[in-house]
């Protein structure tokens, strides 16, 4: 089973791919993203150990949403010793699936925020 995850907006999207069958889920994560993402994945996929690869939308998008979503996805891929790939744009799902199906593994997917982060800029 391959999972495709997009946490770049307040609405999170998960696609579970098993063979040719795809199941799509979406939910409003808001401030519950970190706490609820792993639980949601477990509920929708059954056993996390059945996941054979992860594709993620790496941006651009919400700083917090991408940071939390990619942290969970990267940690899950590392702990399960499975490949992870990232992609951008409207066809990110197809691109991610293609990468996984030819055996690519980015090991760690870094977010693309679309602009420089201003996390160290002083507040006025």
Regions found by a protein language model. Give the residues of each.
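Oxyanion-binding and handling regions
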Residues: 1-42, 46-49, 64, 79-124
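DPxDG-like acidic metal-binding loop motif
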Residues: 53-58, 64-84
